[in-house]
Amino acid sequence: WSSDVCSSDLTGLDREIGDADHGLNMHRGFSKVVEKLPSIADKDIGFILKNTGMVLLSSVGGASGPLFGTFFIRAAQVTQAHQSLTLEELYQMIRDGAEGVISRGKAEPGDKTMCDVWLPVVESLRQSCEQKLSVQAALEAASQQAEVAAQSTITMQARKGRASYLGERSIGHQDPGATSVMFMMQMLAQASRE
């Protein structure tokens, strides 16, 4: 989200069915996370994730701050005292974070929300665990699933969030929150390659 491309893409999507601030909010929040990282980089994964969540809660406006903040705070609980993660631990981390988002947002599949990406990503990671894939292969598969899932929101009518006020006019537009999750999964997959 620190890239201008992500920020611009998300703002453009949000302009169509929201209030045109999602990309700016995500950019601001993750820029604050990047500023904080040097002071916590030597800590365990759980500590870093919890601090990321707290920064997002305090710096990202709209519903996205609480939702992404919740994701990272819940994900932190599974990763306390970890310096690295197995695929099973990564799956548990993302599953728990996604469950926190879904619980907080009270979203269901088909509501045209980030839930429509989180659930397929979690399922993809579960299947990767069963297949005993490497972390990199699992993240590649989850990233591909996230892209398909985000694109699937185009045909949905929004039932949650600001876009729900548009009713049928929300059909034909990709959900910005779902797209944020897709970007996050793409960035995780890219990081696993480096």
Task: Give short role names for the model-derived ranges.
Residues 43-82:
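Hydrophobic/aromatic-rich structural module bridging two neighboring secondary-structure elements via a short loop
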Residues 1-7:
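Short, small-residue-biased leader/transition segments that mark boundaries at the very start
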Residues 13-18, 39-43, 53-63, 103-108, ...:
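A short glycine/serine-rich beta->alpha loop
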Residues 37-48, 77-93, 109, 130-133, ...:
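Phosphate-handling active-site elements
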Residues 16-26, 59-72, 169-188:
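Conserved phosphate/anionic-ligand binding catalytic regions in large, soluble enzymes, centered on
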Residues 82-129:
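A structural-propensity feature for long, helix-poor, extended segments
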Residues 11-40, 117-148:
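Active-site-proximal helix-loop elements at catalytic-domain edges
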Residues 110-116, 129-188:
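C-terminal binding/interaction regions
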